[in-house]
Amino acid sequence: MFTSEKGVVEEWLSEFKTLPETSLPNYATNLKDKSSLVSSLYKVIQEPQSELLEPVCHQLFEFYRSGEEQLLQFTLQFLPELIWCYLAVSASRNVHSSGCIEALLLGVYNLEIVDKQGHTKVLSFTIPSLSKPSVYHEPSSIGSMALTESALSQHGLSKVVYSGPHPQREMLTAQNRFEVLTFLLLCYNAALTYMPSVSLQSLCQICSRICVCGYPRQHVRKYKGISSRIPVSSGFMVQMLTGIYFAFYNGEWDLAQKALDDIIYRAQLELYPEPLLVANAIKASLPHGPMKSNKEGTRCIQVEITPTSSRISRNAVTSMSIRGHRWKRHGNTELTGQEELMEISEVDEGFYSRAASSTSQSGLSNSSHNCSNKPSIGKNHRRSGGSKTGGKEKETTGESCKDHFARKQTQRAQSENLELLSLKRLTLTTSQSLPKPSSHGLAKTAATVFSKSFEQVSGVTVPHNPSSAVGCGAGTDANRFSACSLQEEKLIYVSERTELPMKHQSGQQRPPSISITLSTD
């Protein structure tokens, strides 16, 4: 230590003793600008045999208990260097030369564990809930927040982490050493934004030295001094990582990178899961290159905020929406029988297009032709009570059949919601699927048409049997378009129909079909 540096420290010691209490705030404001004093104090602390070490430690303790915030921060900036000097002296078993440093650390610890009234202080931290917004994330919108029993039971519940109460210590031993030092690093990390760059550099350097001393990496780092291993605890290493993470984004990239690697190295040797988890998380979140930082501006850790857009579609298909759609559809009495037939044909077209998409267009044209040419095939099978209404409906069937098909096909191509609704109509309950005793012909027809449809898809040629299917012709209806969505058990009847001979008979086969007539009875 040079004479000039020693003179600066001695002047600083004498100045504070003669300082009146009224001028203490101005003195604290001007103290942080004295860079030469700070560097001289670091050199005094690094020399355990210096005669100025004891008065310097006493002066720093007076600063800390003065109650002035800036004087407290001035003392805290030397805390990493003080911890390193204490651990180095303890490892060399030269306890007598570290008495003043130990007294300063104990004094700061005992002041921090109590509040201004002298009561034991309990520090708490509330872990943020993912269901509530924070500076780190925006919860996704899930629609209306229903007050269910589960939601009410969890309302207001959040996990809180407590630190304390901490007992007072009169001396540092091997049992309580890292409990005290971990708490002191916690206090230092709470004031990281007020620490100068020289303090962050000291933090990174002492973290590297503590982790590699006594291990082969010490020769790689070329650290001189003690060569014995310094024991550390898992919580102490986590607190070191907190300060290093801050140093990454505040102008000390290289030193912080070296310290992070050394902490991972030591945590792997000690098999500490907590520092390994935190260190690897920090390493994975770092950018590829150093961050530019304005050392004179506000210090902060950059975080990425998630977008506020909704992540769940408001048109999502749920069991409630399907049930509501089914009720609405069953309660609508304004639909005519032909409109219901168009909807069933549309659903069946979607089913058959998955099996053989190449024949779907021909099936549509054939169904349209059948609807326009034979509007009154199933009239004999209608109930007497609904004959008048059925006659009026069949008079308008031939005119609106093609219009219905064109409108349905256009709507299905333009909107994805129609496809979802079509899939919903394929869902039949057990009660709707079972036929009534009076409708054995309908069940027989449906089974025959299904078997013929799948035989056509698989490419197997089956000789036509007129007696095995109801409503199928003798020569031209082997591949008719099938209508398999039978959803209204009271409105569906089977009517036999004959196929008029086509003028242009082609070799292309058409999908099998059945004729369905609906009644509003």
From Swiss-Prot:
Q: What is the effect of changing C57R?
A: In HLD5; induces misfolding and degradation, leading to destabilization of the PI4K complex
What result is annotated for mutating L53P?
In HLD5; induces misfolding and degradation, leading to destabilization of the PI4K complex
Q: Is NADP one of the keywords?
A: no
Say what the protein does.
Component of a complex required to localize phosphatidylinositol 4-kinase (PI4K) to the plasma membrane. The complex acts as a regulator of phosphatidylinositol 4-phosphate (PtdIns(4)P) synthesis. HYCC1 plays a key role in oligodendrocytes formation, a cell type with expanded plasma membrane that requires generation of PtdIns(4)P. Its role in oligodendrocytes formation probably explains its importance in myelination of the central and peripheral nervous system. May also have a role in the beta-catenin/Lef signaling pathway.
Alphabetic keyword roster? Cataract, Cell membrane, Cytoplasm, Disease variant, Leukodystrophy, Membrane, Phosphoprotein
Q: What does the UniProt entry say about where the protein is found?
A: Cytoplasm, Cytosol; Cell membrane
Q: Name one Pfam family in it.
A: Hyccin
Q: Where is the composition biased (Polar residues)?
A: 505-521
Q: In which tissues is it expressed?
A: Widely expressed. Highest levels in heart, brain, placenta, spleen and testis.
Q: What is this protein called?
A: Hyccin
Biased composition range(s): Low complexity: 355-373
* Keyword Membrane on entry: yes
Q: Give me the ranges of the annotated region Disordered.
A: 355-413, 501-521
Q: How does it assemble?
A: Component of a phosphatidylinositol 4-kinase (PI4K) complex, composed of PI4KA, EFR3 (EFR3A or EFR3B), TTC7 (TTC7A or TTC7B) and HYCC (HYCC1 or HYCC2). Interacts with TTC7 (TTC7A or TTC7B), interaction is direct.
